[in-house]
């Protein structure tokens, strides 16, 4: 278990324990559901078309703490009309102590979103069902593949900063 300091930052690891990856907190940062054409949309006999948009944001909170936000927007079109738009921003605070920058980058880009994704999947499904629509289950996402693609793009752009390079957030 890691200790937490009074400002929310993860306490440095004891030299005897070595590197550590911890989940400090998981929370919903933002959630929205809109069904602009309800209730008439329920009578439409059109095959719905779904569009999924996925985004990840990383913010350094302190020397060893990072916030990772997994944002998912699912839009369902029924012909020319929008059946619903479900948006979820699921976040977590992760402690990464005693790791090199490359390992931190890999964990932020792969393991953190893998930890957050089941929460996103459940919340999206619950929102859609509560809106009166048939259940929809997000299929697994290959975050390792997405991370590899991001690395490739960074290399093409001349080594853009890694996820771990973000500056600590200031107090607003």
Swiss-Prot record:
Gene Ontology MF terms: unfolded protein binding
Gene Ontology BP, a term: protein folding
Superkingdom of this protein's organism: Bacteria
InterPro entries reported for this sequence: SecB, SecB-like_sf
Matches recorded under Gene3D superfamilies: SecB-like
Subcellular location(s) per record: Cytoplasm
UniProt keyword terms in alphabetical order: Chaperone, Cytoplasm, Protein transport, Translocation, Transport
Function: One of the proteins required for the normal export of preproteins out of the cell cytoplasm. It is a molecular chaperone that binds to a subset of precursor proteins, maintaining them in a translocation-competent state. It also specifically binds to its receptor SecA.
Protein's name in the database: Protein-export protein SecB
Originating gene: secB
């Amino acid at each position: 278990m890691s200790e937490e300091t009074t400002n929310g930052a993860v306490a440095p690891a004891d030299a005897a324990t070595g590197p550590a990856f911890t989940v400090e907190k998981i929370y919903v940062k933002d959630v929205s559901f809109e069904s602009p054409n309800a209730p008439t949309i329920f009578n439409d006999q059109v095959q719905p078309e779904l569009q999924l948009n996925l985004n990840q944001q990383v913010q350094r909170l302190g020397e060893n703490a990072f916030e990772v936000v997994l944002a998912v927007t699912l839009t369902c079109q029924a012909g020319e009309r929008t059946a619903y738009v479900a948006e979820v921003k699921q976040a977590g605070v992760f402690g990464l102590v005693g790791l090199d920058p490359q390992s931190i980058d890999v964990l932020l880009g792969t393991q953190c979103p893998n930890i957050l994704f089941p929460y996103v999947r459940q919340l999206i499904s619950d929102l859609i069902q509560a809106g009166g629509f048939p259940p929809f289950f997000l299929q697994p996402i290959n975050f390792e593949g997405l991370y590899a693609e991001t690395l490739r793009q960074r290399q093409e752009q001349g080594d853009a900063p890694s996820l771990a390079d973000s500056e600590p957030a200031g107090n607003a």
